[in-house]
Amino acid sequence: EPVRVAIVGAGYMGRGIAHQFLKPLTGMRLVAVSNRTITEAERAYTDAGLESVKYCETLGQLEETINSGDAAVTEDWANICCSEQVDVVLEATGEVEFAAHVAMKAIEHGKHVVLMNAELDATVGPILKTYADKAGVVITNTDGDEPGVAMNLVRFDKTIGYDPVCAGNINGKIDHYRTPDTQRAFAEKYNQKPIMITSFADGTKLSMETTVLANATGFGVGQTGMFGLECDHVKETLNFFTPEHFANGGIVDYTIGAEPHTGAFVIGYNEDPMNQQYMDYFKMGEGPLYCFYTPYHLPHLQITTTVARAALFGDATATPLGKPTCDVMTKAKRT
């Protein structure tokens, strides 16, 4: 039987995810979309070329529609969380308080929860993880967003016998003083909200994502706000970091302006002389620090691996290890 996925939040990212699930995709099925504006929920289907969509007001209507194989839309997110016809709830609103209610309701009813919502995860992720563990379900951030991409590299490093000591985002640029007005034209070009695009440009989203990554690895930060290394290529992080930077444990950080300008990186440590010789031969440097990176992050595509991982293997892509190791603070841009 295919994994049955329901999406809460049909904004820019929610629609992109729906589009991927509505194309030929082995072993998974998008069964419902919930949004406070029902026309946007319908759009998640119609943008993918599916015109026949059924509006479901009650839980009974929702379950009947899913059972019949039809596309369901609803304004009532709680029905999605309660439905026995849903295996995975994908939260993609970008809200914190509302999304916390969605996650808790889904966990209460035995659903795995996939978060396309770094804001929620950075704020109360460790608390939600505690409830998910008690309920025997998975709550996880997603592959394709930087924390998930970095966690794949962390697991890879550990698998090959390297100790991950630094992980983070590869950023094009950061300007802490960007505003919705400065970002409006760019937002309109890509059919997004100026306030959301501002959060990408001014470092807000970055801070949330690296906090999610820190809580998933147990890492801290090298300094308040992180170092934010400006360099031409992500591999040049090795020109800055030394083993002494990690004497008190691993850290999260980010690059600015470094090729490949997107994706995530992890610095792994290995001091074995023979390994160092081989790594130098294969153009990875002299060691003992080595930079591993993924030159892309494609959340609307890669999220499918997170859904499968959670539903089929009970395994999380990126989830808090325990209590928070990092948090996000805000600063006023003007007084």
Model-found features: residue ranges?
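C-terminal catalytic/substrate-binding lobe primarily of soluble NAD(P)-dependent oxidoreductases
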Residues: 1, 186-335
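N-terminal glycine-/serine-/threonine-rich beta1-alpha1-beta2 phosphate-ribose binding loop
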Residues: 1-105
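Generic secondary-structure signature for well-ordered alpha-helical cores
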Residues: 22-26, 46, 50, 130-138, ...
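Hydrophobic beta-strand scaffold residues
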Residues: 30, 73, 113, 138-139, ...
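Short gly/pro/ser/thr-enriched loop/turn and capping motifs at secondary-structure boundaries
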Residues: 39-40, 120-125, 129, 146-150, ...
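Rossmann-fold NAD(P)-binding glycine/threonine-rich loop
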Residues: 93-109, 116-137, 142-144
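Rossmann-like NAD(P)H-binding beta-loop-alpha module
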Residues: 132-136, 140-201, 205
